[in-house]
Amino acid sequence: MDYDYIIVGGGSAGCALANRLSEQKKNKVLLLEAGKSSHPLSRLPISFAMLVDNPSANWRYRSEPEEGTSNRQIPVPRGKLLGGSSSINGLLYICLLYTS
């Protein structure tokens, strides 16, 4: 099958882009995501802690050891399901102060 657009990564931006491109009926859009289409725990705000160390929902990346962290590796959660990291962040967001 032929596609006009192939989007790799079904995170927030990839999904938004695929949606926007597919609004034009002539466009054939393929959205690729390595993980599952969803995870039951991703819909419950309190359960994000269970997804952070779950290999089916998180790539489980770690930072490189650095002097400033006493040579520790710090977990860097990255979502591995449709919606990407937004699906494992516990539905949290940060609002800046108006004065910022």
Describe each PLM feature range.
Residues 1-11:
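Beta1/beta-strand and adjacent pyrophosphate-binding region of the FAD-binding site
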Residues 14:
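N-terminal Rossmann-fold NAD(P) dinucleotide-binding loop
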Residues 21:
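Aromatic pocket-lining residues of Rossmann-like dinucleotide-binding sites
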Residues 28-33:
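Short beta-strand "acidic-cap" motif of Rossmann-like dinucleotide-binding folds
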Residues 34-77:
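N-terminal FAD cofactor-binding segment of flavoenzymes
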Residues 81-89:
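FAD-binding core of FAD-dependent oxidoreductases
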Residues 91-95:
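Glycine-rich FAD cofactor-binding loop and adjacent beta-loop-alpha segment at the N-terminus
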Residues 98-99:
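Conserved small/polar residues in nucleotide/adenosyl-binding loops
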